[in-house]
UniProtKB/Swiss-Prot annotation:
It comes from Vibrio parahaemolyticus serotype O3:K6 (strain RIMD 2210633). This is Autoinducer 2 sensor kinase/phosphatase LuxQ. Pfam families: HATPase_c (PF02518), HisKA (PF00512), LuxQ-periplasm (PF09308), Response_reg (PF00072). Binds the complex formed by the autoinducer and LuxP. One of its GO terms (molecular function) is phosphoprotein phosphatase activity. SMART domains: HATPase_c (SM00387), HisKA (SM00388), REC (SM00448). Its EC number is 2.7.13.3, 3.1.3.-. Residues 488-710 form the Histidine kinase domain.
Amino acid sequence: MTITSKLKKRRSLSTLITKIIILVLAPIILGIFVQSYYFSKQIIWQEVDRTKQQTSALILNIFESHFAAIQIHHDSNSKSDVILDFYSERNEEALNYFFLSIDQSDPSHTPEFRFLTDHQGIIWDDGNAHFYGINDSMLDGLTSKVTFSNNWYYVTSITSMGARHLLLRRVPVLEPKTGEVMGYSYNAVVLDNNFALMEKLKNEGNVDNVVLVANDIPVASSLAGDESYKIFDVLKRKETQKKLDQLLIIQTPIEVNAAITNLKLLTVQDNQSVVTLQIQHFLAMLASVIGMIMIALMTKEWIENRVVEELGSLMSYTRSAREEKGFERFGGSDIEEFDHIGSTLESTFEELEAQKRSFRDLFNFALSPIMVWSEAGVLIQINPAARKELVIENDIETMHPVFKGFKDKLVPHLRMAAQGATLTGVNVPIGDKVFRWNLSPIRVDGDISGIIVQGQDITTLIEAEKQSNLARREAEKSAQARADFLAKMSHEIRTPINGILGVAQLLKDSVEAEEQKNQIDVLRHSGEHLLAVLNDILDFSKIEQGKFNIQKHPFSFADTMRTLENIYRPICENKGVELVIENQLDGNVEIFTDQVRLNQILFNLVSNAVKFTPSGCVRLHAELEQFYGADNSVLVVEISDTGIGIESDKLDEMFEPFVQEEATTTREYGGSGLGLTIVKNLVDMLDGDVQVRSQKGQGTTFVVTLPVKDRERVLAPLDSSQRVKPAELFDESLKVLLVEDNHTNAFILKAFCTKYKMQVDWAKDGLEAMEFLKDHSYDLILMDNQLPHLGGIETTKEIRQNLKLGTPIYACTADTAQETSDAFMEAGANYVLLKPIKENALHEAFVDFKQRFLIERT
């Protein structure tokens, strides 16, 4: 775009004032004329419409009156003695004379032709039908088209002379004495070229001409041929009265016997007076426009003589300010408005000069480097701070290596800013320092005239960020090492716990003395307590790493309450503590949330309540709050006890990790101090809330609220196989391959399997298991995870992919991470058991195996 094209054409003040006058007066004058023209046009059109309606009604009335008169004569003639005698005597001469005398007495209401019929056919006609090309057979055919009533019928007949449009009616000829129908009298009016009818309509309707059309084809008209228009013009202009024309065409549809026909009467009237009035309106508007232009020109001349001189001095003052010749005072003007403008401009120029000085000071004394670049990447202006950093002492020393290297790195960003982008946080070094630059395009009248670049020294910040990233990576490495350590410790601790709990279960089944059973229970409870502490530590570690998974599904809350009661009622009875469970939920209601995490929350809270209540009562109250219109219900569980209670100033700390009320509490009651922390985090993950109330020595109450979805469920009866004894679960002895590297775990699992009449082969690692499977077939494979040589997951893949075996594989792992279970299932396992393996969990696994594989097989 050239500079010339950017400049707009300037106009003088007189021209602008003239335009203003025109713009003000023109709408007013034009508005008046347009409004006048509009209302006049509306009145004219209303008058035209009224004229059209009146003319149409008059023409239709004349047309109907004409045929009504013919109908009256026809009805009267049919009762004449001459016609009655003709039916008996057939005296045609008398009949012809009768009709001739009638036609001569009233020729204006005479039909074009007549004929009489009896029950055999036509017995007489006046012979006029042949003049219209209608022969005897056509005449006979017309009788079949008029079969009902005495009304007129519109009939079109194709003759040798072309189409003929007729109005035809009949009346019965009755024998006066008996009333018998002797025959019918027919009258026919031919509309084609019926000049007499058209003249009658023209004269009586007071119109210039009349045209009768059928299907937009002219049938008859009153045009004499000396008019300035033809029938074609009338047809072309009918119903096209959107603009006023010299001819006013009125269209009148013809109804015959209450039925719409294709006949229409077009009347023509002279409309010259209305057209003349319209032309006069246009001429008046044109005259007003010419007058307005003349006034504008005279006004312009007067303004130029009166105002231009004073305006010239004002323009001269503004030009001097634009040319930056220095600040000057305005000399004043005789015109008050111009003097005010000049004084205002003087104040404005003075303020602008002060702002320029302030900007120069800000630019020159700023501690941060500031530069102005052109769109082409040429340095336009630079402040002293930037000169110092870039080692530029004067404008010609821009080839210094420091500046050259800086410019090479900055140019790509300058190009982006030249396209209109605003760039922030661009790091470009100068020597050993790192500066963060902001680049912003300078826009003038929508076009980019330059780019301002501002920098900030962030060398110290960059170094601090490096140290922070290094510390973060070290912390992540430490957290990962701790997670790996906990995972390994989980496996190493769970393995001996598995042996302790497994042997305790086996011993309890093999002894009969009550004292020995109690001792074994102590051993088992101690192992389970150790396992609970380990689980708390592992769960807390997962929460810290964000690896705790929430998996929601529908389940029966009543089943959860039943399980909780079965576990803690015996414990409460042994302590002499009353356990009260109040479940207000309907037994047929399922709730939708994470069952495992809900169990963990409730078991932790009930376990704490039982643990810290030496005597008294532990109460659990559950109810479901439902709100109208809400998507979710709210499960409210309140767990209260009459235990030792908590000091009020310690309540806020109870959900912190490794916190108990006092150090002696841990020694007296045990625990990891993580239970409430895990509860708080699980409740938050389920979008719920947990509150605590307590008084020292009086007890504690925890209230858990969780949003859940609820629905009715159909309770299915428990499968009988879940209630049978181990030895009766399977109908035949099953062959099981146990893959386990730990002798203790293998011993316990083999002992459990023996109760189910299973034959167990023991493989100590994955490679040995592969050899067993090549030589033998098995009903079930129990697969450990951490095996020497070939791990459990890898062994499972080998069995599925290389050996192509579909033998059910039930994995046994001490790793509680969800990733491990998912990896086993992805490799081809059918079930995952967590160590330490309890007898009930193993029983459920065997029930699952029977239902999924043995029942399907049979």
